[in-house]
Amino acid sequence: MKDFYKLYSVGKSTKKPYSRGKSFGYQVLGFGSGFSSAIAHRSVWGGAFQPSKSNVIDFVEIATAGNATDFGDLTVARFRNSSSAASSTRGIFFGGNSDPTRLNVIDYVTIATAGNATDFGDTSAVSQHGGAGNNDTRAVHALGDVSDSAVNTLEYVTIASTGNT
């Protein structure tokens, strides 16, 4: 299982054969920094550093321990802690790094149906290492690192519709 990371219920992954957490399963591809969107029954994450950027989106069914399954592809391969948010039906992925450039891309997926991400719109600036929070209607995105310096910019989108921040 050279290219797989083991998932643990404590929210960590490892290639080690032991851990303090209870085994959950394996990811389709290993990751260094990715992101996730979760609703009551499914966790979805995309992008990776394995050892390079990735456009792969994986998911697991939260109620059932087991290996991750390929969900689809992001519109742009990326890594470096893009941020994400989700409503009960849609997951959104903000920004990241496509090496050598930061991204302003926003992608979305319908969480209940596996498939490729679709372009949602753009953030106001290229960024990486951002953060996001949400309720079922709105996602708030903190830009994070813009041009090698942190910024204090918050932006939002309405999850059910597409468009720029």
What do these predicted regions represent?
Residues 1-165:
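Polar, enzyme-active/binding microenvironments
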